[in-house]
C-alpha cells in the first residue's frame, strides 16, 4: 500500500515539474521585460516623450 502511494506521488511530481518547466519557457518568450529594447540611432529626428526613445539623448530635435 505504501509503495503504491509513493509511486503515485512520484508520478504526480514528475508530471507537475514537466508542466512547470514547459510553461516557464513560454513565459520567458512572451515576457516584455526580456525583449530587447529598441531605440533610435543618432541623427534621427526626435521629440520629448517619443514612443521609441533615442539611444542617447534628444538634442535640438535630433538624437545625439
UniProtKB/Swiss-Prot annotation:
Location (main, coarse): secreted
Disulfide bonds: 39-55, 46-58, 54-63
SUPFAM superfamilies hit by this protein: omega toxin-like
Highest taxon of the lineage: Eukaryota
Tissues with expression: Expressed by the venom gland.
Signal peptide annotation: 1-20
Protein keywords: Disulfide bond, Ion channel impairing toxin, Knottin, Secreted, Signal, Toxin
GO cellular component term, pick one: extracellular region
Propeptide span(s): 21-38
Annotated function: Probable ion channel inhibitor.
Entry's family note: Belongs to the neurotoxin 36 family. 02 subfamily.
Protein name: U6-theraphotoxin-Cg1a
Species of provenance: Chilobrachys guangxiensis (Chinese earth tiger tarantula)
Amino acid at each position: 500500500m505504501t509503495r503504491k502511494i509513493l509511486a503515485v506521488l512520484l508520478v504526480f511530481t514528475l508530471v507537475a515539474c514537466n508542466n512547470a518547466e514547459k510553461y516557464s519557457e513560454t513565459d520567458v518568450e512572451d515576457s516584455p521585460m526580456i525583449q530587447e529594447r529598441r531605440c533610435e540611432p543618432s541623427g534621427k529626428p526626435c521629440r520629448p516623450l517619443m514612443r521609441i526613445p533615442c539611444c542617447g539623448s534628444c538634442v535640438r530635435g535630433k538624437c545625439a
